[in-house]
């Protein structure tokens, strides 16, 4: 019999995990690809999940160029075959994650929603731009003095991003994304 005898008992250990708010990621990747999930997706292939507090904020940080660079340079142990690298839990735990600051965290969380909705609707220009904003905000959050001295602050110019909510229709979500993109991309 190929099914382990303790399968039901082990299944109880994971009971409810996939229905929680979580970050889903693959272990071997070409680039960071952390997905914030609230819909209870069940991955069809090997994937890992992070749960806990501030998962949406953490999604933004983990997908940023800065933390991806730090992970690849100091924790990934070099590239695997084909330019891929491995996100191992033991090394992810060592990343220098800064505790969320209220204003920055809200902006990053709103941008995660904007990016994920834009990607689902194939809005590549908007999602790429919002990803660049996250990268800039993460640099600003980790290196505030250097960014301020260089006169490259983003947060003071960002304003309050209109949130995307579950009760919005798809058309309303896309309209919010387009308005925010238009407002920020070419002010």
Regions found by a protein language model. Name each.
Residues 1-106:
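Polybasic, glycine- and aromatic-enriched phosphate-binding surface used to engage nucleic acids
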């Amino acid at each position: 019999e190929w099914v382990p005898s303790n399968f039901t008992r082990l299944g109880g250990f994971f009971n409810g995990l996939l229905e929680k708010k979580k970050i889903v990621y693959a272990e071997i990747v070409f680039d960071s690809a952390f997905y914030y999930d609230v819909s209870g997706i069940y991955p069809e292939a090997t994937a890992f999940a992070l749960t806990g507090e501030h998962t949406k904020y953490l999604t933004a940080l983990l997908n940023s160029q800065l933390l991806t660079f730090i992970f690849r340079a100091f924790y990934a142990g070099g590239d695997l075959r084909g330019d891929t690298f491995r996100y191992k839990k033991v090394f992810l735990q060592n990343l220098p994650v800064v505790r969320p600051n209220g204003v920055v965290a809200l902006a990053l969380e709103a941008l995660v929603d904007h990016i994920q909705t834009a990607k689902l609707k194939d809005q590549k220009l908007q999602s790429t731009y919002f990803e660049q904003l996250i990268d800039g905000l993460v640099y600003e959050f980790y290196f505030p003095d250097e960014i301020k001295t260089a006169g490259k602050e983003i947060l003071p110019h960002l304003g309050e991003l209109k949130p995307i909510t579950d009760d919005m229709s798809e058309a309303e979500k896309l309209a919010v994304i387009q308005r925010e993109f238009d407002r920020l991309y070419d002010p």
